[in-house]
Amino acid sequence: MYGGEEFGNSDFYDDYAHTGDPALDLEYERNFYANRMPENVKYFLMNFCQAIKEGNLYDIQNMYENTFPQISDHHFDKTAWPDEQEVGAIVDNDKVFLILYKELYYRHIHARIPGGPKLEQRINSFFNYCDFFNLIISAQNPVMLELPDIWLWELVDEFVYQFQNFAQYRARLTDKSQDEIQQLCVNHSNVWSILCILNVLHSLVDISNIKKQLEAISQGIDPQTVAGDFGKLAFYKMLGYFSLVGLLRVHSLLGDYYQAIKVLEPIEIHKKSAYSHIPACQISTSYYVGFAYMMMRRYADAIRTFSDILLYIQRTKQLYSTRSYQNDQINKQAEQMYHLLAICLVLHPQCIDESIQQVLREKNYHDAMFKMQCGDLEVFKSFFVFACPRFVSPCPPAADAPMEDYVKDPMEHQLLVFMDEVRQQKDLPTTRSYLKLYTTLPLTKLASFIDPNASEDDVSKLLIRLLCFKHKMRNLVWSKGPSGLEGTFKSGSELDFYIDDDMIHIADTKVSHRYGDFFVRKIMKFNDLNRKLKNINI
């Protein structure tokens, strides 16, 4: 009757058939995708969803920090996790969980997939962040969602990172077709735009009232009295705090260092805070604050910021050493800060903690520092390029721009600004080295040291150089107050001088090491430790 047709061939059937009954279709999808997924992945996703529904912070944090990376290493090292459709069938299409899962899904693609994410994945990741932030910001009442602080920090940090990554991707026109450029500039011009990023971060700061809460804490007032309905919840409060750090990073990437420090005004960045319990957040904050200070020529503040955080890293390394992804990131940022600290110490010599000096010696930074002191501009340049943030432009290239690679333009501009400052100071170490040898020195003699064939014109130029020395060694230094922009002008040089007629009078202002204070602090710390040990009941 049917002419011997073969109906046994599976190609004639749809593996993903629907019955028309929503309940049966959902059950079919769940079974269909579950059979394609490894059992441990399926159970992890179901348990992860359940823990988030119940707000079980301990289980959420354990699965986020331990189980998810372990499964990623075992099953998805160089591939993507299951997509939204597959996961949705297992977790009953739970809207909140799927948004959070997709945040991890796209983060994994950015970090692990060779070649990086495709344009469509970058766009989808942006819209997923929009869904998440709209869910929590646009709600009339606070969303009852609890996530561990480490996830909230990494969510905000990843949001800023993906903006930075997309800005660099968009600026690289040489590897794109005309259709792709048209799509980026016309169809998706608002995707990962700087205005969207700033709007989201400021909205999180505002809805949490985090600035008012920080001001209340500094005045000894209960922050709950000014927190509002949203800010009372740890979820919103921590998102607001981390958004301040996100704004610091964004403004630093744009090269607006004044505004970068300005957004942190409620945070007393030189003091420990109850909010600074996430090591990666504290380290990132200090890196961008220190870099901003360096670019603002506030070297004393930059040196203090870098020294404090590098000491913190030395003392707390065991807290994150078991987490390889955090360890790698923190080690890289620490290495960058050692490079920046070396630059600052050459431009503005001063005493620092002996343990930091020891690291600089062990890692042979002193050789490079000696070359910088001798005026080797290439070493300055290589240190800056290695240690600086990956700057971005707030405006993408126009659709009709020449087909060039614009990625390096922002960095080259910042390098130009930095090297211009270095060139103004490159002769100062030589001047300082001569002045340190004398208490009085005639101008003509100093001029002859610098140039044996010095003329009267060279003596006049020497006066300009000495004035430059005075000017460059006088910095604005923070002393107290919540604003990192405040401070008083102080001379940071180890020597001071004045000129009377043609004679230079020099005073060595170097403060000798006070080892007694060091030992007193260690003894007090040891006694405190003894008291705590005696109070422990075994």
Swiss-Prot record:
Transmembrane segments: none annotated. One of its GO terms (cellular component) is eukaryotic 48S preinitiation complex. The keyword Protein biosynthesis applies. One of its GO terms (biological process) is formation of cytoplasmic translation initiation complex. Keywords: Cytoplasm, Initiation factor, Protein biosynthesis. InterPro entries: eIF3l, PCI_dom, TPR-like_helical_dom_sf. It holds the Pfam family Paf67. One of its GO terms (molecular function) is translation initiation factor activity. It is found in: Cytoplasm. Residues 305-513 form the PCI domain. Component of the eukaryotic translation initiation factor 3 (eIF-3) complex, which is involved in protein synthesis of a specialized repertoire of mRNAs and, together with other initiation factors, stimulates binding of mRNA and methionyl-tRNAi to the 40S ribosome. The eIF-3 complex specifically targets and initiates translation of a subset of mRNAs involved in cell proliferation. HAMAP family: eIF3l (MF_03011). Component of the eukaryotic translation initiation factor 3 (eIF-3) complex. The eIF-3 complex interacts with pix. Belongs to the eIF-3 subunit L family. This is Eukaryotic translation initiation factor 3 subunit L. It comes from Drosophila virilis (Fruit fly).
